[in-house]
């Protein structure tokens, strides 16, 4: 499984950390009290495609597999100081979840909790995916009329967001998983 956490301390130092052992319980191998991952499944085990071209994500010594993990820290363009931290679990849809949350905060004016809870959507180029039960029939029909296949599916993000509003930090935890927001006064 994959987890994400966002943290800010009293000095404004920010962390966005996404960690994964791939599938539930990873490789199911315990070493020194922790589970080893099975991230090798992120590689393409075929070195060449049907046309004989090398696949970029093929297994090679010293190489890391491609990943969709996208822990994100947003910096204020004027001061260069961190003003937001966010990320999510969710496999190949992580980038969609983070992009949706950033757009929700910056352009739709949502607060951190609203952005984390907003309906999920994404595209692979061949299909458009909408979070099941979150988009009405006219919206789905309008998207389908534009060409790509539209599929309603479960999109269980787990987005965690911290964003600075004035001199305070606001948090949001995705209700689709067991995330939470906590604050401590020094």
Identify the role of each PLM range.
Residues 1-153:
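Proteins synthesized as precursors that undergo proteolytic processing into mature forms
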């Amino acid at each position: 499984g994959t987890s994400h956490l966002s943290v800010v301390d009293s000095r404004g130092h920010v962390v966005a950390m996404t960690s994964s052992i791939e599938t539930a319980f990873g490789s199911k191998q315990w070493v020194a009290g922790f589970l080893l991952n099975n991230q090798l499944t992120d590689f393409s085990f075929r070195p060449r495609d049907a046309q004989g071209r090398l696949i970029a994500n093929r297994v090679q010594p010293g190489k890391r597999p491609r990943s969709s993990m996208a822990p994100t820290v947003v910096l204020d363009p004027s001061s260069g100081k961190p003003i937001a931290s966010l990320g999510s679990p969710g496999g190949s849809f992580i980038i969609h979840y983070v992009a949706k949350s950033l757009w929700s905060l910056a352009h739709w004016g949502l607060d951190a909790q609203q952005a984390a809870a907003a309906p999920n959507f994404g595209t692979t180029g061949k299909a458009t995916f909408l979070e099941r039960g979150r988009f009405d029939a006219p919206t789905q029909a309008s998207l389908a009329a534009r060409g790509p296949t539209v599929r309603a599916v479960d999109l269980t993000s787990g987005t965690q967001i911290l964003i600075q509003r004035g001199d305070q930090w606001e948090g949001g935890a995705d209700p689709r998983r067991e995330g939470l927001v906590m604050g401590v006064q020094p």
